[in-house]
């Protein structure tokens, strides 16, 4: 389901991103009508543990607007999948796994109009949220094997440079897990009695 089709009052105007949908993630609180909490994860990931465990990591915390893995690294490549640009910037990949506290006052600023007019830097750096209200999640919940190497304890693998379906990333660390999941997703039980 293309999420942008759910927002007739939103027009994607950004030209500074690697793809046309990288800003739609910030529409999640609006989609949730600014109530409850919600998880957003990028599409180039494999969740290796029960996602309820991720959901529960915010339980018991009262003063937070968003929960993220607070990566601090420099990328290995200036170009990623399909020739998309890959730049270093503060808080890189923080917005790739988020638990939103949708009903907080700061997140009510995330209207379609605000997102259309904010820069990518403003959005991906969470400039409308005070730093002390950005809850930190364990790094295992947004592990970047193509940047950090393999981690058998990772709860979520994020192939941020390019999924192993692209030839140039086919042998990326822990790429075999991607290939296995792809094979299982495409598997179809066949009749053997013919």
Language model region names:
Residues 30, 56-59, 87-90, 125-129, ...:
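A general structural signal for short secondary-structure junctions and capping/turn motifs
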Residues 77-84, 116-122:
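Active-site glycine-rich loop that binds ribose-phosphate moieties when present
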Residues 13-17, 82-87:
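Short, P/G- and charge-enriched loop/turn segments at secondary-structure junctions
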Residues 2, 97-194:
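A glycosyltransferase accessory/donor-loop signature
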Residues 24-76, 99, 106:
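GT-A fold catalytic core of metal-dependent nucleotide-sugar glycosyltransferases
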Residues 77-83, 89-96, 100-106:
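Internal, well-ordered alpha/beta segment that forms a basic, Gly-enriched binding/recognition surface
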Residues 1-34:
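Active-site-proximal specificity loops/subdomain of glycosyltransferases
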Residues 3-10, 74-76, 142-146:
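A short acidic, often aromatic-flanked loop/helix-cap motif at beta-alpha or helix-coil junctions
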């Amino acid at each position: 389901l293309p999420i942008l089709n759910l927002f007739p009052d939103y027009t994607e105007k950004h030209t500074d991103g690697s793809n046309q949908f990288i800003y739609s993630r910030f529409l999640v609180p609006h989609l949730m009508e600014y109530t409850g909490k919600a998880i957003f994860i990028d599409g180039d990931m494999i969740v290796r543990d029960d996602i309820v465990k991720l959901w529960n990591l915010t339980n018991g915390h009262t003063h937070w607007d968003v929960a993220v893995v607070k990566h601090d690294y420099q990328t290995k490549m200036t170009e990623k999948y399909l020739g998309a640009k890959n730049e270093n910037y503060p808080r890189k990949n923080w917005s790739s796994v988020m638990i939103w506290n949708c009903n907080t006052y700061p997140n009510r600023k995330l209207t379609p109009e605000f997102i259309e007019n904010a820069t990518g830097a403003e959005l991906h750096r969470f400039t409308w949220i005070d730093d002390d209200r950005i809850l930190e999640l364990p790094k295992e919940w947004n592990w970047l094997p193509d940047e950090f190497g393999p981690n058998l304890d990772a709860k979520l693998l994020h192939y941020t440079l390019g999924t192993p379906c692209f030839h140039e990333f086919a042998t990326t660390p822990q790429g075999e897990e991607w290939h296995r999941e792809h094979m299982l997703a495409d598997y179809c039980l066949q009749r053997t009695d013919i």
